[in-house]
Amino acid sequence: MGIENESPEPDCQKQFQAAVSVIQNLPKNGSYRPSYEEMLRFYSYYKQATMGPCLIPQPGFWDPIGRYKWEAWNSLGQMSREEAMSAYITEMKLVAQKVIDTVPLGEVAEDMFGYFEPLYQVIPDMPRPPETFLRRVTGWKEQALNGDAEAAPEPPCLPKEPAPPSLESQPPRDQDSEVFCDSVEQLEPELVGEEQRGALGGENDTRNSPEPPAEKGRLEGPLLGPQELDSWLVGTVRALQDSMRDVQGRLQSLESMPMPPEQMPPPSARPRPLRLSGPTLIFFLLWPFIVQWLFRQFRTQKR
């Protein structure tokens, strides 16, 4: 009974797998690129839905991207897998609506809408573009099938829905092998595509350096990519280590070098023994007795 309660509903899992398939197959240079916050939300919901609560340790300070991902996943706490799948689907709906509202209504937009078509079959309330765009995409497919691909624009390859993986059979992973995506669980368009597609501006093949999530999705321009940033950090740390070793070596060499004679401290003066003559020494030994004898003589005479 416990397993049945924990397993997600079939419809929810089917919708989740369709949404993951769409995210995986978004074009590398498409007209829409999710923001940094959206990428982190997709990543955290996917990890929660497939692996459960975050149990891996927090990455070190030298892995800022890994820390962002860990914090996003860890923030979900004890959210159930079904709730995470539902949240992933809800986020997918918001992204689809954002595409409809923001992407220019041109041929590129028609391309983009085609990638969401598998979701319309499994998610009834999925936001849809105007029917004219869907008809144009359908017309492209028919022309391609009829052999008129040269006379009409070639439609984009629609993503194929992968076979749903067994959630219980997935072993836990300590840390992602890639900078922003798992080597097997390629889910987010930018968590996968950031290191492959370039910055969010869409014109460079490098990714912005880690910035706060609210600003990351809006930055443009060639900044350090994740691999370049990692290489730079590793090089900096190694340079610091080399500098520390050099300083330690110099200190050890200075400590082992003999000091010049002019800087050597003078030898400590040893106390000289008290040299007294024999009569003087006898006087020092007998003077208390002499004083005592004289004092007694004085008292006797006084009486």
Curated annotation (Swiss-Prot):
Phosphoserine PTM positions: 166
GO molecular function, one term: fatty-acyl-CoA binding
GO biological process terms on file: fatty acid metabolic process
Keyword Cell membrane: no
InterPro entries: Acyl-CoA-binding_prot_CS, Acyl-CoA-binding_protein, Acyl-CoA-binding_sf, FERM/acyl-CoA-bd_prot_sf
Region Disordered, residue ranges: 148-178, 191-224
Domain of life according to the entry: Eukaryota
Keyword Secreted: no
ACB domain residues: 12-101
Pfam families assigned: ACBP
Keyword entries, A-Z: Lipid-binding, Phosphoprotein
Function: Binds medium- and long-chain acyl-CoA esters and may function as an intracellular carrier of acyl-CoA esters.
Record-given protein name: Acyl-CoA-binding domain-containing protein 4
